[in-house]
């Protein structure tokens, strides 16, 4: 694989600002969870949102809707009973709003190849299809202050080693863990092979610890390994940030 109304559940905004510290690790009240804070800039640090709320969005190809449906259904079994499905968004700022207000987010669609002034994996299609993209969300659209703790980008190239790949930039701008593919992935529904729908189902079952995962939560890292084993054609092989974390 190479708008709808936005209604956000705004949790408590725990912003810690510092003009001196660029990178820090802080302990949330009561020692419940450690966050690796990676935001840099004049405003300093931003704490990841911890509201047990999920969201999905996708490119316009009909077949990727199965993938976001699978992710949504898995999240809703045990973790968030009302996951927000934004479908195909129509502006890049909508993506930033999603990545500010939801703890876990899943995207399925397409990453870019090199060309048109962009390096490989620096953009994803947010409107249109892989063959006919209408709108890209690229690394330079990402803003500081993103608070999503876990973002899975099910798209080709978006997590490659390029410093400006979308995964690398989003992690620098506040997302705690970004999971994606360094190369191409395949969503073939042929010969009985598992597809990216299977990957999404297994990953979100395991990372949320729902009934299909025997109520055993895995870290994002562990869930990625298990999903890759179940659907190796859809190999999301790279993690950026702190993915040894639970949602």
Curated annotation (Swiss-Prot):
It comes from the Archaea. This is Uncharacterized protein AF_2165. It comes from Archaeoglobus fulgidus (strain ATCC 49558 / DSM 4304 / JCM 9628 / NBRC 100126 / VC-16). The lineage of its organism: Archaea, Methanobacteriati, Methanobacteriota, Archaeoglobi, Archaeoglobales.
